[in-house]
């Protein structure tokens, strides 16, 4: 299977990446590769099933890290509420400023992301556990545990973090794959 851009990981960040890539590159052929049987499974468990999207109190003045550009990024990033409103999902804040979907159901967030990606023609390959990525003359060769072989000019890795491995993400996966790509494409 060939694609222009492969996005490894079909969670919230993988689906959002697909939507944003389509916005920036409307003609690009996109493929989301998800190791589980469906995209967005972990979204359903976030925020105790309500999916806490953001917080009204996010501000550069609350950032205390060492990255000096963070304030600029925070101040000029669209809010989660605006992003999801653009996807057709209404949000509401609770008394502590936490932003949830108006429905108070994480399934609404998954539906908004998945439907927008589908509306935009993003292809999704589920049940495909990526075992290797190799750099090639034309981009990348991606091998899956099920025998599927995918070639892509570009790859976005959005495989999730370490939290809640019972939902199919263990975090170690992304580091192993990135380490393999880096070691194969860069000389020490």
Regions found by a protein language model. Give the residues of each.
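Beta1/beta-strand and adjacent pyrophosphate-binding region of the FAD-binding site
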Residues: 1-13, 31
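Glycine-rich FAD pyrophosphate-binding loop
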Residues: 6, 22-48
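Short, well-ordered alpha-helices that flank and scaffold nucleotide-derived cofactor binding pockets
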Residues: 19, 23, 115
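Hydrophobic anchor at the start of a short beta-strand
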Residues: 28-31, 91, 155, 181
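Glycine-rich active-site loop/strand segments that organize a redox cofactor
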Residues: 47-96
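Short beta-strand to alpha-helix junction loop
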Residues: 68-78, 95-115, 125, 162-169
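Residue-level signal for inorganic ion chemistry
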Residues: 84, 113, 177
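Predominantly flavin-linked oxidoreductase catalytic cores and closely associated redox partners
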Residues: 107-108, 116-188
């Amino acid at each position: 299977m060939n694609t222009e851009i492969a996005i490894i990981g079909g969670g919230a960040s993988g689906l959002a990446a697909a939507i944003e890539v389509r916005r920036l590159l409307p003609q690009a052929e996109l493929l989301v590769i998800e190791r589980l049987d469906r995209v967005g499974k972990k979204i359903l468990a976030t925020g105790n099933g309500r999916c806490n999207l953001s917080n009204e109190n996010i501000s550069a003045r609350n950032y205390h890290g060492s990255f000096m550009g963070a304030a600029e990024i925070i101040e000029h990033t669209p809010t989660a509420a605006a992003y999801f409103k653009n996807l057709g999902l209404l949000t509401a804040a609770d008394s502590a400023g936490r932003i949830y979907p108006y429905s108070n159901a994480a399934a609404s967030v998954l539906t908004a992301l998945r439907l927008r990606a589908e509306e935009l023609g993003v292809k999704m390959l589920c049940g495909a556990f990526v075992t290797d990525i190799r750099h090639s003359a034309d981009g990348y060769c991606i091998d899956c545990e099920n025998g599927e072989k995918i070639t892509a000019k570009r790859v976005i890795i959005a495989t999730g973090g370490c939290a809640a491995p019972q939902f199919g993400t263990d975090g170690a996966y992304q580091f192993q794959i990135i380490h393999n790509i880096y070691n194969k494409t860069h000389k020490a």
